[in-house]
Regions:
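Core catalytic lobe of class I
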Residues: 1-175
Length: 175
């Protein structure tokens, strides 16, 4: 078994890789402009809105498809994006998970499955200070409170050329 780890801009790395060379990609893509990771203008987190984010993703997603071997998976760590009353006019959620799935499907990927990663709402409340999850908000304005937000690992599969799939097999360990 061999593997390689890359620490570089994903668009740079993908463009240099040959076709059908990756068995598994595990990534946590930026959640649009929810967090800013650097001041680099190429950074996907430095977008002004979701439209700009998905316009940028439209360059990366086909490259990920090209370099992924047929039948293999990309695992995407995601979360829903909260909206804020001051910025967005109301507190709620944007279905970022669904938007990412649709963006990948547009480029030929198949939605293969997902894993829900439940998080402790008390830790989330302490970390984010989000009024919608704080106990004090619940006591005063219960109608604005929500549950804690889980993360998701969305699994997308490259389904093409099934006759070329290299099947994964496991020896029976009971023998």
């Amino acid at each position: 078994m061999s593997y390689k780890l890359y620490n570089d801009d994903c668009v740079n790395v993908c463009s240099q890789l040959p076709d059908d060379c990756i068995d598994l990609t595990i990534t946590s893509i930026p959640f649009a402009n929810l967090y800013t990771y650097s001041d680099d203008p190429r950074d996907f987190s430095n977008v002004k809105d979701l439209d700009e984010f998905f316009a940028q993703m439209n360059y990366l997603i086909p490259e990920l498809y090209r370099i992924t071997r047929p039948g293999r998976i990309i695992a995407l760590h995601l979360m829903q994006i909260p909206t804020f009353k001051g910025r967005d006019g109301a507190m709620g959620l944007i279905d970022f998970r669904g938007m990412v799935i649709k963006a990948f499907q547009k480029h030929g990927w198949i939605f293969h499955g997902e894993i829900t990663v439940f998080k402790d709402p008390q830790i989330e409340a302490t970390r984010t200070k989000s009024a919608s999850i704080l106990w004090n908000s619940y006591k005063k304005f219960a109608e604005i409170t929500r549950t804690g937000m889980p993360d998701y690992v969305v699994l997308m599969q490259k389904v093409e050329r099934e006759d070329e799939w290299i099947h994964v097999t496991h020896d029976n360990i009971d023998d």
